[in-house]
């Protein structure tokens, strides 16, 4: 098995330099992603002066031919077009992701040469090169270990040089080139795990769930756009809302409960880092960071955010904002358990959930109310939740609802959920950069990280 640094430049593919057909990037996806539940690779093409759908058709055809040459007969290529371009995704085994990326690039180069009227690139020599790379990259022990973990219901974390089975206090990590023949599974296990995504409110909701875990006496940790923390210890500061943050957190042996803030960029660049979360929250979806990786509209962005459902374990709960039209529209095709939350008990999704005996949460008469599908619980009044500023910060009522439903899905009792809500504050200690209030020369000054029109509207 070749190491990742040896595979980075294993094949030099002559991609045409023409502004009308540009391969803007090709990257490996280490876990579930926008396109499907499996790891793989995806390429982004920028197309001008050609019909994107026709270009994608030709690109897909070459990719399928090369997959057949590799013997990957079960790999289902997926493509999508967007305004001014196309994406092509190829699923692959965990030890064939470089090969999949090279295949996408090779198929693009041959397609572009043809469409631009350049000298034809021979296909068979390229297929031989791909077979060589596939053989060099192959790591049967890694593939077998990951497959066995999946059969046992145990999650995995992957990077270029290591593999981890389980989470936190139940995790074991090996170098990918020195895997055990027969690992001792006795103490390998997952821990309660939630994902949080959305345009705004991700970090606050992530911090809230972790605070609920701590209130329940667990060693709770989180990864976020600002830091990775286990208990009260910050392991590192920076934007850790992608797979690197998840690995840093979930490999800590002290950890008993985890919350991952999952940003759009991490999902699109590397896929989701885990496969067996118990809960995933989508706070909302609004225009932000559009125009990257082929995501041009709010509707397309909603599809990216809701792809977190692919990282849920069987029976895991997807927790969605019923007051967000983009979230509601993007959820219609999903076949996973959904818990809706809303600022009104009369929202259609809340009414339907209550009729169907499904979990949900809502705001009514100044109270945060939860239902497990059988029993309704008056959890707490917003006057007792400092984060809501007496109910004025309605966006934080939504965040509290999503966090409470996630905490329940992680198996936490209502008492610590209620306790965390009553203690957690919008101050630089509990929630830095989020509606932090200061007194300056007799004036009340609020500092908030609001950075897009949706968040600015929410805090004004």
Where are these regions (language model features)?
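Long, compositionally biased, glycine/small-hydrophobic-enriched stretches that function as flexible linkers
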Residues: 1-141, 147, 158, 162-168
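Buried hydrophobic packing segments
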Residues: 145, 209, 213, 249, ...
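Adenine nucleotide phosphate-binding catalytic loops in nucleotide-utilizing enzymes
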Residues: 295-302, 306, 336-457
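Short polybasic amphipathic segments
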Residues: 162-166, 226-229, 365-375
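Flexible active-site lid/hinge loop adjacent to a nucleotide/diphosphate
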Residues: 230-340, 345-349, 384, 453-457
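Walker A (P-loop) phosphate-binding motif
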Residues: 182-227
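N-terminal pre-Walker A segment at the start of P-loop NTPase domains
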Residues: 164-179
């Amino acid at each position: 098995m070749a190491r990742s640094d040896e595979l980075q430049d294993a094949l030099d593919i002559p991609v045409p330099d023409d502004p009308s057909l540009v391969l803007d990037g090709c990257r490996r996806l280490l876990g579930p992603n926008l396109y499907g539940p499996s790891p793989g690779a995806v390429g982004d093409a920028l197309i001008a002066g050609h019909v994107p759908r026709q270009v994608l058709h030709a690109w897909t055809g070459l990719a399928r031919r090369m997959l057949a040459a590799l013997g990957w007969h079960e790999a289902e290529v997926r493509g999508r077009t967007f305004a001014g371009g196309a994406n092509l995704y190829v699923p692959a085994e965990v030890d064939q992701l470089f090969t999949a990326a090279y295949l996408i690039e090779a198929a693009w180069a041959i397609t572009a040469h043809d469409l631009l009227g350049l000298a034809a690139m021979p296909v068979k020599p390229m297929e031989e090169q791909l077979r060589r790379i596939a053989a060099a990259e192959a790591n049967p022990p890694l593939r077998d270990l990951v497959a066995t973990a999946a059969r046992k219901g145990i999650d995995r974390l992957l990077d270029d040089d290591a593999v981890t089975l389980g989470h936190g206090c139940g995790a074991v990590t090996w170098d990918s080139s020195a895997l055990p023949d027969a690992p001792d599974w006795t103490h390998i296990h997952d821990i309660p795990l939630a994902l949080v995504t959305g345009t705004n409110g991700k970090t606050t909701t992530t911090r809230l769930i972790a605070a609920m875990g701590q209130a329940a006496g667990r060693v709770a940790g989180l990864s976020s756009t600002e830091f990775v923390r286990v208990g009260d210890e910050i392991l590192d500061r920076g934007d850790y809302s992608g797979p690197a943050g998840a690995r840093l957190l979930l490999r800590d042996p002290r950890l008993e409960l985890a919350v991952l803030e999952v940003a759009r960029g991490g999902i699109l660049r590397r896929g989701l880092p885990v496969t067996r979360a118990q809960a995933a929250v989508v706070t909302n979806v609004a225009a932000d960071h559009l125009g990257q990786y082929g995501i041009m509209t709010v509707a397309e962005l909603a599809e990216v955010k809701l792809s977190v459902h692919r990282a849920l374990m069987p029976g895991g709960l997807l927790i969605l904002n019923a007051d967000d039209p983009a979230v509601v529209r993007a959820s219609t095709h999903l076949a996973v358990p959904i818990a809706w939350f809303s600022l009104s008990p009369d929202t259609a999704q809340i009414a339907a959930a209550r009729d169907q005996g499904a979990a949900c949460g809502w705001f009514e008469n100044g109270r945060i109310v939860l239902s497990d599908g059988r029993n309704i619980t008056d959890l707490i009044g917003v006057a007792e939740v400092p984060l809501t500023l007496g109910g004025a910060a309605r966006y934080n009522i939504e965040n509290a609802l999503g966090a409470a439903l996630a905490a329940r899905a992680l198996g936490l009792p209502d008492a610590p959920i209620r306790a965390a809500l009553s203690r957690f504050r919008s101050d630089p200690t509990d929630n830095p950069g989020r509606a932090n209030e200061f007194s300056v020369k007799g004036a009340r000054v609020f500092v908030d990280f609001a950075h897009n029109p949706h968040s600015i509207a929410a805090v004004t």
